[in-house]
Amino acid sequence: SEPVQLPFIPHDDPRVIDSTGALDLTDIPERLLILGGGIIGLEMATVYRALGSTVTVVELADQLMPGADPDLVKPLADRLKKQGVSVHLKTKVTEARAGKQGIEVAFDGDSLPEATRYDRVLVAVGRAPNGAKIGAEKAGVAVTDRGFIGVDKQMRTNVPHIFAIGDIVGQPMLAHKAVHEAHVAAEAAHGEKAYFDVKQIPSVAYTDPEVAWAGLTEDQCKQQGIKYGKGVFPWAASGRAIANGRDEGFTKLIFDEETHRIIGGGIVGTHAGDLISEVCLAIEMGADAVDIGKTI
């Protein structure tokens, strides 16, 4: 896949960067505008604010990190605000022009940034698959108008001996999902009965604090009409978190009310990206919420 480019942004100007360019800067911009309040945008906001940049984040949706439950995102949003990151929700960029002193930007929405000139503009509004750019159709492989390649549960395309994995086969565009798909494809190609059939794919934002979730979110449960319960442990009740001076986080488990099986969970706090693996295992193994509650 490749970063999505916006037609009204001067992408030919070196001061306009994507996530790859943001990791390759030779200087620290004084004023950085980030278009997109998703995982990548917020990770870069965390990094560059720590390096001393004045950071502004603009997000079209009504919350940061769309797709995550709002309660998981709130501790991160509060800390970003405390650190001086300027966040503007339900707001979009309507125009950007390259000037001598910086990139001049015009906004529209509910929360307009005060600044209109920036030293760097990071475009982090998503990624697009490269299915239409690899000549797959020459081999008879079907490619959608958006550049995705359809596959079955064995990662086979419409041409049975050709497999596809990773960003090109659909969301979520995550490396660890692609690795699992590769295992399935390799085993299927070897003649084994392997299938991509998982109950969860973890997502992690390496921000400060980290945000991680797996399985179904509360919003997804509501949309699918699933009756669920949840258990939340505030890190303010954790001696270790208090000793570390980072007790703003919490751990949440979501379970099916009828079966008590764990179907989702989320963690916000330091090292959440490491801790989420336990939630992933609980979901895949069909762990019982009552059993977990009785575990010391």
Q: Residue ranges of each PLM-predicted region?
A:
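Glycine-rich dinucleotide-binding loop and its adjacent helix/turn
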Residues: 1-54, 58, 83, 87, ...
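A short alpha-helix-loop-beta-strand transition element characteristic
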Residues: 2-4, 88, 142-143, 192-202, ...
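Active-site substrate-recognition segment that forms the wall
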Residues: 41-60, 82, 156-161, 169, ...
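A Rossmann-like FAD-binding core segment of flavoenzymes
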Residues: 51-153, 216, 223, 227, ...
